[in-house]
Amino acid sequence: MCGIAGRILNTPGQIGADLLALMDAQMHRGSDSTGFALYGIPVERGYLVRAMSPKRSSLSADLEEFRATLKAHGSDFLEDPTWDNAETQHASVRMVIDEPKNLAAWVRDADTFSDHLEVQSVGKSLEIIKDLDSASDVAEKHGVQDFVGTHGLGHARLATESSVSPTASHPFWARPFPDVAIVHNGQITNYFLSRNRLERKGYRFMTENDSELL
């Protein structure tokens, strides 16, 4: 039993605050974790990247290694990375990067580093923000209520099978396609069979959440 909300605005506006109100109204649908896929004002150059670090204490060193994967693909940070100032062990990181020569190839390399810094979204305007706890708590921690954009998705999760963690939360980025995010409510009964088939074709999964299969 999870909760899903969506919002579209004709012109850029307070999409974060609107989605927060929608998610607060269905907090009874699940409060293990909450996530938002927010579409803001597109960057003129490069991509917005959201990532999750499981170990805040090593974040600075991990970002340097992450930067090396960017440089290997003809990219680099266009701005200094920023992250939340919470006291949790994990940290949500926001980056603006130059466009890699081949986005899919860079994502494959970056995913090998996911134990240290997991890419959760890439796009011209998409930013996926997700974390443990209720919508209001997640929004306050990450400033969701101040986000300006045109559309977005929200998801309140009540975990049934896979773990409760920031990375297993919804929404999911449809890697490696920029600006594509999904949320899902339900259970995919042939998840493991389908996952095994896709892994044999070279697809990489970051969690055991069946929604990632979509």
Question: Where do the protein language model's features map onto the residues?
Answer:
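Conserved short alpha-helical segments that host acidic/polar catalytic motifs at enzyme active sites
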Residues: 1-214
